[in-house]
Amino acid sequence: MKHDLETLKHIIDSSNRITFFTGAGVSVASGVPDFRSMGGLFDEISKDGLSPEYLLSRDYLEDDPEGFINFCHKRLLFVDTMPNIVHDWIAKLERNQQSLGIITQNIDGLHSDAGSQHVDELHGTLNRFYCNVCHKSYTKSDVIDRTLKHCDNCGGAIRPDIVLYGEMLDQPTIIRALNKIEHADTLVVLGSSLVVQPAAGLISHFKGDNLIIINKDRTPYDSDATLVIHDDMVSVVKSLMTE
């Protein structure tokens, strides 16, 4: 492990176009449940009596707008979550002008909360909301502080700005993500199993020098990586910062 940390530190210190690709594992230490792991968010959502895929779908929003927004307020707001040391470390590398930015599968908005400016959120973010009818924009603070569920302009359901089942990923976001990967000298994957498509397929576009994967479990790209560390991200970053 010590040798891996030394290798990781050397690669990070010698890179100046790092792109980060992050998944659910990064935010677990902040109290955000992993969606699909045992005991994760999907398990919790299943207790509501409908399938997680339906509750997080465009169909549910259209079939039962009131039920959808009540579900969002109950399960998705993550009111007390804060960035952890991994989010802070990534933001610091961006401030030091070593990083091109972040591509994330997460919807919790914690990278932005940590101060990162260049974040491509493939599945959207819970930091932004909008009316499903007139598209008036709202912040997360608007929704939480006022327990706001209906648009004060037209009365429509206020939904989070996330990609629901049955909706397309935002193409400008995909293009920006591809650009970050194609121009990176080092790609660091953190807390992602790299199996969810089409997001995970972006990794195949990396042609830079070093692919680093830090994840508790194996991924389909482990054999292609310069360095693989199967460990907890928080532990790795803490150790890295004391090296």
From Swiss-Prot:
Cysteine disulfide links = none
Query: Which Pfam family is one of this chain's hits?
Result: SIR2
Protein EC: 2.3.1.286
Compartments where located:
Cytoplasm
The UniProt entry lists the main location of this chain as cytoplasm
Top-down, what is the taxonomic lineage of the species of origin? Answer: Bacteria, Bacillati, Bacillota, Bacilli, Bacillales
Tell me what reaction this enzyme catalyses: N(6)-acetyl-L-lysyl-[protein] + NAD(+) + H2O = 2''-O-acetyl-ADP-D-ribose + nicotinamide + L-lysyl-[protein]
Q: Where is the Deacetylase sirtuin-type domain?
A: 1-243
The molecule here is called: NAD-dependent protein deacetylase
**For binding nicotinamide, which residues are annotated in this chain's numbering?**
35, 107-108
